[in-house]
C-alpha cells in the first residue's frame, strides 16, 4: 500500500463498486479501522460526529481509517438503473475483502451501526482471519419474520421513506419529542441520500436472514464471532432487544456489552465522548495504545470509575506495549474477577 491513500476511492468488487473514504495512512502492522454505516445514512451522517470528537482523533492518529459506504448511499450517488439488483446482506459482506486487499490491510477493527453492524458481523463470520475486533452498535442478529415484514410493508404505505427509516434509527421518546436531532436527520435523509437507492438498501436489510450464531457450548458445532466484540446500544433504542439477544449468543470471555444511558438511538452521535472512552479500553484490551492520556488532567491516565470497571471486565492483554512497534498483539482470553464479586459479568451498563 502506498504511504497515503487519503481521500475517496471507488473499489471494484464481485458485486459492484464500493465507495470508500480513507483517512490517514497505515501505521506499521496495526489494523485499519473500517466503518460501515446504518441504513438511511452514509459514512458522514453516521460517523462524522464520532470521528471528529477530539479524543477520538487522538485514537485515530494511531490507525488508518477506512469508511465504507453501502452501494449507492454516498453523497452525490447516481440513481441505480431500473431493474438493478441490490446486493444481499451476505453479498455486502463478501464485497469487503476486495477493499481490504486493494489497500493491503492485513486485518481490520470494524465499527458498524445497525445494518452496518450486521454486515461486519457477517464479514467476520465468513472471513475471521481478516477481523481483529468488532464494535457493533445497534446490531439485530435476527432476520425479519412474516409479521415484522408485513408491519414494515404497512409502514411503508402510510409513512414517507425518511420517517420509516427514522423509526429504525431513533427511540420512540426521541420521535415523539421530535428533537432537533430527529428533525435534522429527517431533512438530511430526505435530501442527502438518493431515495430510490435507499429504498433498495432498506428492502434488502428487511429481507435479511438470521446471523446464525450461537454461544459456544450451547449447541453442537456452534458458530460465533471469534474476535473480541464490544456491543453498544442506547437506552430505549429500537435495537435494544436485538443487541441483548446478540450478547447472549456470543462468547462471554471476549464480549463486552455497553448499554449507554441518555444516548437514544444513535449513541455515536449523542454520546461520542462515552463511546470514545469505551473504544479506548477496547483497543487496550487487544494490546493497542500503550497508555491513555486524559487531557483534562496533567497527571495523565486517570479514567472514570465506570471505565475502570470496563477495563477490568475486558479481555486482558498480555502485550499492551506491542502497540509501540505495531506488531499484532496476542490477547489471553481468561476473564478476571472483580473484588468480592466472583466471576465478572461482561454486561456492563455505562451510566456516567
From Swiss-Prot:
Tissue: Expressed predominantly in brain and heart (at protein level). In the brain, detected in astrocytes. Isoform 1 and isoform 2 are only expressed in brain. Isoform 3 is expressed in both heart and brain. Up-regulated in glioblastoma multiforme cells.
Region feature (Disordered): 314-352
SUPFAM superfamilies the record matches: alpha/beta-Hydrolases (SSF53474)
InterPro entries linked to this entry: AB_hydrolase_fold, NDRG
Disulfide cross-links: none
GO CC field: basolateral plasma membrane; cell projection membrane; cytoplasm; cytosol; endoplasmic reticulum membrane; plasma membrane
Residues with Phosphoserine modification: 298, 317, 323
Post-translational modification: Phosphorylated in an aortic smooth muscle cell line, following PDGF treatment.
Biased amino acid composition, Polar residues: 330-352
Subcellular location: Cytoplasm, Cytosol
Summary of the function given for this chain in its UniProt record: Contributes to the maintenance of intracerebral BDNF levels within the normal range, which is necessary for the preservation of spatial learning and the resistance to neuronal cell death caused by ischemic stress. May enhance growth factor-induced ERK1 and ERK2 phosphorylation, including that induced by PDGF and FGF. May attenuate NGF-promoted ELK1 phosphorylation in a microtubule-dependent manner.
Position of the signal peptide: none
Pfam families (UniProt xref): Ndr
GO biological process: cardiac muscle cell proliferation; cell differentiation; cell migration involved in heart development; embryonic heart tube development; heart looping; negative regulation of platelet-derived growth factor receptor signaling pathway; negative regulation of smooth muscle cell migration; negative regulation of smooth muscle cell proliferation
Name the record gives this protein: Protein NDRG4
Compositional bias segments (type: Low complexity): 314-323
Family to which this protein belongs: Belongs to the NDRG family.
Keyword annotations from UniProtKB, A to Z: Cytoplasm, Phosphoprotein
Amino acid at each position: 500500500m502506498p504511504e497515503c491513500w487519503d481521500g475517496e476511492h471507488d473499489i471494484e468488487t464481485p458485486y459492484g463498486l464500493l465507495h470508500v473514504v480513507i483517512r490517514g495512512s497505515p501505521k506499521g502492522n496495526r489494523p485499519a479501522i473500517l466503518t460501515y454505516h446504518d441504513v438511511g445514512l452514509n459514512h458522514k451522517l453516521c460517523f462524522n460526529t464520532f470521528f471528529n470528537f477530539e479524543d477520538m482523533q487522538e485514537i485515530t492518529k494511531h490507525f488508518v481509517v477506512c469508511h465504507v459506504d453501502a452501494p449507492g448511499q454516498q453523497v452525490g450517488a447516481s440513481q441505480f438503473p431500473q431493474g438493478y439488483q441490490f446486493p444481499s446482506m451476505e453479498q455486502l459482506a463478501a464485497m469487503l475483502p476486495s477493499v481490504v486487499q486493494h489497500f493491503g490491510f492485513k486485518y481490520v477493527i470494524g465499527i458498524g451501526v445497525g445494518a452496518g453492524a450486521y454486515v461486519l458481523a457477517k464479514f467476520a463470520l465468513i472471513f475471521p482471519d481478516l477481523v481483529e475486533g468488532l464494535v457493533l452498535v445497534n446490531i439485530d442478529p435476527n432476520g425479519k419474520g412474516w409479521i415484522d415484514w408485513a408491519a414494515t410493508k404497512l409502514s411503508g404505505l402510510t409513512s414517507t421513506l425518511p420517517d420509516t427509516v427514522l423509526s429504525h434509527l431513533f427511540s420512540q421518546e426521541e420521535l415523539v419529542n421530535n428533537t432537533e436531532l430527529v428533525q435534522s436527520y429527517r431533512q438530511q435523509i430526505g435530501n442527502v441520500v438518493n431515495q430510490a437507492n435507499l429504498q433498495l438498501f432498506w428492502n434488502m436489510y428487511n429481507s435479511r436472514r438470521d446471523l446464525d450464531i450461537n454461544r459456544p457450548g450451547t449447541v453442537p458445532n456452534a458458530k460465533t464471532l471469534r474476535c473480541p466484540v464490544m456491543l453498544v446500544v442506547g437506552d430505549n433504542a429500537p435495537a435494544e432487544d436485538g443487541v441483548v439477544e446478540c450478547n447472549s449468543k456470543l462468547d462471554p470471555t471476549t464480549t463486552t456489552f455497553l448499554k449507554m444511558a441518555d444516548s437514544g438511538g444513535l449513541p455515536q452521535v449523542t454520546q461520542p465522548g462515552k463511546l470514545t472512552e469505551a473504544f479506548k479500553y477496547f483497543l487496550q484490551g487487544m494490546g493497542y495504545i500503550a497508555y491513555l492520556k486524559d487531557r483534562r488532567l496533567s497527571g495523565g491516565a486517570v479514567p472514570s470509575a465506570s471505565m475502570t470497571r470496563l477495563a477490568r471486565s475486558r479481555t486482558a492483554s498480555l502485550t499492551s506495549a506491542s502497540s509501540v512497534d505495531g506488531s499484532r498483539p496476542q490477547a489471553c482470553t481468561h476473564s478476571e474477577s472483580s473484588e468480592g464479586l466472583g466471576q465478572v459479568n461482561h454486561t456492563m451498563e455505562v451510566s456516567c
